[in-house]
Regions:
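Short, basic, glycine/proline-bearing loop/turn elements
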Residues: 36-41, 94-105, 129, 180-182
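Conserved catalytic-core segment of NTP-binding enzymes
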Residues: 106-121, 130-230, 242-244
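Residue-identity detector for glycine
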Residues: 8-11, 20-24
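Walker A (P-loop) phosphate-binding motif
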Residues: 27-58
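N-terminal phosphate/diphosphate-binding loop that engages ATP/GTP or pyrophosphate donors
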Residues: 55-102
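General beta-strand structural signal in soluble alpha/beta enzymes
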Residues: 41-42, 62-67, 98-101, 125-129, ...
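Short, low-complexity intrinsically disordered segments enriched in A/P/G/S/L with frequent Arg
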Residues: 13-15
Length: 244
């Protein structure tokens, strides 16, 4: 397992499209150009919801798990094991399972089996590889995110609700955000500053702007165009899962 993997080293070609705006019947998994193997989801508000949406949409077998901490998913079987044959049997029965190691406060930590082993059992292993203290935006410390070695795609989630708010209220690790973007702790998070933070860290292959419908098209455009100019693919959407 490794920390802070810079993008561009996955061995997978980046999609040619630079910006996708959610609409019609295009699934999130299609917009993200999901590929089989390990996908790491990092960033802020909406990571766990994105994991669930992808599990619902993808047609193959799926393991939802974490390299940090995550709560179990309601309605999705939880498997705690170091036996890969149990994993295969569970996937054959349920198609989608959650895996991890029980920890404090009902949370799960990383599973007992290596992610590379899980990837040999399931079509997709989707790993929540970050935490954000439930804030809409985040800057990463040197030990973050915790991206598995064999990750083929890294998706960064950003919540549009953080735009227009003071840095110290909207950003997890605001001091790092300020250092990388030139923002001030009492200053306002603009779409351009949020994008500049992502560019400076250079951790993701693709960026998801969650709750895009809560901001004006012009604000969303400023965010996406700044990222587009640096070669990032951006999906603008509002993440909602269909299962209760």
């Amino acid at each position: 397992m490794r920390h802070s993997r810079k993008r561009g080293h996955s061995g997978v070609s980046r999609p040619a499209v630079n910006m996708v705006v959610s609409g019609g019947f295009m699934k999130i998994c299609e917009q993200l150009h999901m590929i089989k193997g390990v996908t790491a989801v990092i960033g802020s508000g909406g990571k766990t919801t994105l994991l669930r949406i992808l599990a619902e949409e993808l047609s193959g077998t799926v393991i939802l798990t974490t390299s940090t901490h995550i709560l179990p998913f309601a309605g999705i079987p939880l498997l705690v094991t170091d036996d890969i044959e149990q994993v295969r049997r569970a996937l054959a029965l349920h198609r989608v399972i959650c895996m991890g190691t029980p920890a404090a406060e009902g949370k799960l930590t990383a599973p007992a089996l290596p992610f590379s082993v899980l990837a040999n059992a399931a079509d997709y292993v989707i790993v929540e590889a970050d935490g954000s203290k439930r804030l809409p935006l985040k800057a990463h410390a040197s030990h973050e995110p915790v991206i598995p070695e064999n990750t083929r795609k890294t998706v960064c989630v950003v919540c549009a609700s953080g735009f227009g708010k003071p840095v110290k209220q909207a950003v997890h690790r605001p001091e790092l955000f300020c250092a990388r973007t030139g923002a001030h702790m009492s200053g306002i998070v603009t779409p351009k500053l949020a994008a500049q933070g992502i560019i400076a860290e250079n951790l993701a292959d693709i960026v998801v702007l969650n709750q895009a419908e809560t901001v004006s098209p012009e604000i969303a455009k400023r965010f996406t165009e700044t990222l587009k100019s640096s070669g990032f693919t951006v999906v603008c959407t509002t993440l909602n899962h269909t299962l209760e």
